Amino acid sequence: GGVYACAIVALIDCAEYYDPSFYSDSLGTTFWRLWNYTGSYYDSNNSAQGYTNNDKLCSGFKQYMSTRGQAIQTYEQSAPTWMQYKTNADNWNMSLFCAGIIDTTTGMRSGHTMSVQGYALLEPIGVPNEEIKVLGVHDGWNTYARYLNFYFSNYTDTYGAFFG
C-alpha cells in the first residue's frame, strides 16, 4: 500500500502545469516533497489516508515551486467566488477547489480538494434564462475531467487556492 492525499494530487496537477522540468523527478519524489512542504499528515485511523490543511496549500506549493526554480504568485480564500475561478482560468492559470460535505454514512464532515482547469456555463433544456456554473476539475480518482456544480447547495464550506 501507499498513501493518498487529494490535495497533494491536485498540487501535482498544478506542478506539472507550471514546472517545465516537472518530469525530471519521479512522481513519488514530487508527492513526498509536496506532502512535506504542505505539512500533510496521516489519518490516525487510516494510515493510507492523508490530510492537508487548506491554509497550507499556497505556502507549501510556493515553497515547492521555488525549489524547482519557479516563482509563482498565490492567494487563497475561504468561500471563494465564481468570478475568482473564472478570472483565473481565463488568464490560463490553475487553482484548487476545496469543499466540505456531510458524509451520509458517518454524519461527519468530509472534505475533498481538486485542481481546477476550466469552467463551463450550462443551460438546462426547457429552463429559459437558467444557467448552471460548473468547474472543470480533476477529481483525483479519474483520468478525465469532471464537472462540478459550483453552487451545489450541500457544501458545508469551500476554500480556494489560486496560482499564477
Question: Which ranges hold each PLM region?
Answer:
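Cysteine-nucleophile protease catalytic domains, especially the papain-like/related folds used
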Residues: 2-77
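Solvent-exposed loop/turn segments at secondary-structure junctions
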Residues: 3-4, 12-13, 40-44, 48, ...
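Compositionally biased, low-complexity linear motifs
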Residues: 22-23, 92-94, 110
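Short, Φ-rich (hydrophobic/aromatic) sequence segments
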Residues: 34, 87-91
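Short, well-ordered alpha-helical scaffold segments within catalytic/effector domains
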Residues: 58, 82-83, 113
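Loop/turn elements at helix/coil->beta-strand transitions in domains of secreted/extracellular proteins
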Residues: 60, 65-73, 90-97, 131-133, ...
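Surface-exposed ligand/attachment interfaces on beta-rich extracellular proteins
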Residues: 77-88
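Active-site signature of cysteine proteases
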Residues: 98-164
